[in-house]
């Protein structure tokens, strides 16, 4: 079955369908959708990430609504009770992002385009993994500042692909942010050489990070290597993370020419 009227409640599915040339199927989007920029003018907004206007969605008569994980379970349940087909993605890894692209291709009968898109990303990731680095800098990714939360799995994987070392790899596999909460004194002993921060849409303040008690001798603080990566580029498990998000990590680790 090829779905013709799709509502996307996550940013990454919106971007993916546009990249596949299937934007004509989209009848509604999350309020956070900004990629590509023209989506703001082209598609009606039907809610935020953990809330949605069910009546507005129903009025659009979708034959499919795309959601993400347990975070949107209540929304999905309401849609299902209304008789609307729902597909819930639950990916949190680079491999999962690539599978999401291929699944969207299958749902819209454009498997060739989806395979080409995913294969292109895979080729670049493979090439980057094979790049030799004389030193792999230790990297701390801060997903939130209060409490401090370390990076989710796909972010950790992209740091490794870019040539860095995630200093909390044991936490990256934890899907829930509450299980990646850190006390401030847990970071200095791991001596990150680069700090990447993306505070879920809130502006990162490097001076606030640098001023944390006990952090003054952290190598990244002493070297001034605190870099913000905008949340839409790295915290959505989709094409943005594999392109602009990865590019931002590369630039932070190796300079703008990387």
Regions found by a protein language model. Give the residues of each.
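N-terminal ligand-binding lobe of clamshell/alpha-beta domains
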Residues: 1-258
